[in-house]
Amino acid sequence: MPDLLIELRSEEIPARMQRKAAGDLKKLVTDALVEAGLTYEGAREYWTPRRLALDIRGLTARSADLREERKGPRIDANEKAIEGFLRAAGLSSLSEAHVHNDPKKGDFYVAHIVKPGREAEEIIADVMPAIIRDFPWPKSMRSGAASAKPGSLRWVRPLQSIVCTFGAEHDETKVIPFEVDGIVASNITYGHRFHAPEAITVRRFADYAEKLEKAKVVIDAERRKEIISADAHNVAFANGLELVEDEGLLEEVAGLVEWPRVLMGSFEESYLEIPSEIIRLTIKTNQKCFVTRKPGAETLSNRFILVSNIEAKDGGKEIAHGNGKVVRARLSDAAHFWKRDQSDLPDLETLTASAEKFGLDLKKPLDQRMAKLDALNVTFHAKLGTQGERVARIRSLAAALARLTGADAASVDRAVVLAKADLRTEAVGEFPELQGIMGHKYAVLQGEAAAVADAIEDHYKPQGPSDRVPTDPVSATVALADKLDTLVGFWAIDEKPTGSKDPYALRRAALGVIRLILEGSARLPLLPCFDVALAALKAQRPDIRAEISADLLAFFHDRLKVYLRDLGARYDLIDAVLAPDADDLLMIARRVEALTAFITAEEGRNLLTGTKRATQILAAEEKKGTEVAESVDEALFRLDAERTLHASIKVASDDARDAIVKEDFRSAMQALSKLRAPVDDFFNDVLVNDEDKAIRANRLALLGLIRSATGEVADFSKISG
């Protein structure tokens, strides 16, 4: 079967756009071909800084014929209706139509229409111009002489050539003829811009990839990453160093070069006095280079790894030297703002009011920055006030949380008032990724307690499912207060996540709260926390929306389900223990854990069967309006199975309740498991729907006791199986 090769070659595509663009090309082309009636065996996308490529294997050479039956008017219809039918069906006379009999409606004309399939080449030539013209670039531009015309092509960077070849493996390939804004599809591409700029004639993908490789272009981005990683490790090792891994930078650099050549540069050791985080970000952000260190060391070396797109005649010495000069200049700037952040601000007399508000010491640089942050009224959000107001809210909430977490109240308060101070430092102004990290470093330099300094850095954590969770009580308390203030605030102004949109990362904040509570084994009822946070917000914004707790708690329940499901818990078991007002996340998680262990054991499965039968019968009768006694009357028992079940429920309920009070959910489940035999005997020996209404109502009340007893632990009706 034929294969299809497409290449769209342009000026340099931004690295951050390449992977998605190649995926978009694959989806758009394959979707269009399938919609047109073609099928294929496989497709893979490729990309470099200057090209998007698509290799489609086993594409059918022609789409199948389509057969359609079009129903017409009755055979005794008027002439006008029949003429309209013939015209619509493309028939020249009634002799080409068929007559179908309908026993109820009589005889009808029917047209059997055959739409012949189309050649794949025709389909490809038809769909490709529209795909290219409507390509979903985040940003695009017009270029060249055609750009002055209305509707001219927009591409991320000027599009220079199109390759489109089609043919079976052992046959000569054909060029699919189409053009876009004067760019005509061909079988001609070009190699490396400097090393091999000559035209290359290609047939199919294997030939294309091989010829590009000879022309100093590695078409496979994953292979470029492997080359860069392996060579970088080898160069570092050869110099007695190890590479500091950075997957994001590796992805980016692989999108900057077509022919990766790894080199090593250096800078003066005096710059190593700057914090490693600043050095790493300076070199990464500005020069797209990797840093190195001595094997096993925490601190960096003065050597860095760069990736060139050129195979230089001097082995890359001049390139490495040039990069070193730029790195030194950048590090000189970094050293300057590192020192300035440790010096006094020039306008301390204007910061007195802010210092008094937060209990700050204006002799200390970080305190000065916090006072400056407040004095400048830096906006956090237009509807939620300034950063200073936010710190005041977090301070109030953190004080309440400290009483629940057992954290030292003074340390928590000090950490909160300094947590956002580094937002006014030059280091964070240059590298926003360092907020918290620089606050920690400056806090240590001015003599803050270790717990306070750690909390300043850790209060942003965890920032994702794999990020570290702070375990120190002070850090955890400040992190919880920060995230809960964010969530309550945005709920109060009704700016919640919708669909895939979550501009304020509120899902991540909720997951952070969940992980802090569960992984820190914290007993922290959420509803009172919401109330404290909301009260602090209303003190600043009296007109703020107040009724948010139920909706915000439901949001937490949804995120908790996702978190527990990722850990292997079943959704139905989570639902079974999750009451609408359940705000103790640790207790919910422990109940799910106990229920999972119980329900997967034989005794649990058997009890589930009996309990669900009881609740289903009771629910059905309640729906029909059947009378159910308010309480069980032992005098109405007629069989031993009733008496035994009633006594067993009382014992099991008491034991389960005692265990729940102690939060021993496994023991509560085991207590309920003793109902298995009495429930089985009851359903074997007793007819619930007795003819006597009083006996029936009493037996239904007994089923109600089963539902109530098991409901202390979970809603068994929600458990599948």
From Swiss-Prot:
A Pfam family: tRNA_synt_2f
Sequence intervals crossing the membrane: none
Protein name per UniProt: Glycine--tRNA ligase beta subunit
Subunit: Tetramer of two alpha and two beta subunits.
GO CC aspect terms: cytosol
Top class in the EC scheme: ligase
GO MF annotation terms: arginine-tRNA ligase activity; ATP binding; glycine-tRNA ligase activity
Plastid among keywords: no
Reactions accelerated catalytically: tRNA(Gly) + glycine + ATP = glycyl-tRNA(Gly) + AMP + diphosphate
Domain of life: Bacteria
UniProt-annotated location(s): Cytoplasm
Any one GO biological process: glycyl-tRNA aminoacylation
Family in the record: Belongs to the class-II aminoacyl-tRNA synthetase family.
Principal subcellular localization: cytoplasm
EC number from the UniProt entry: 6.1.1.14
InterPro entries referenced in this protein's UniProt entry, alphabetically: DALR_anticod-bd, Gly-tRNA-synth_bsu, Gly-tRNA-synth_heterodimer
UniProtKB keywords: Aminoacyl-tRNA synthetase, ATP-binding, Cytoplasm, Ligase, Nucleotide-binding, Protein biosynthesis
Organism for this UniProt entry: Rhizobium meliloti (strain 1021) (Ensifer meliloti)
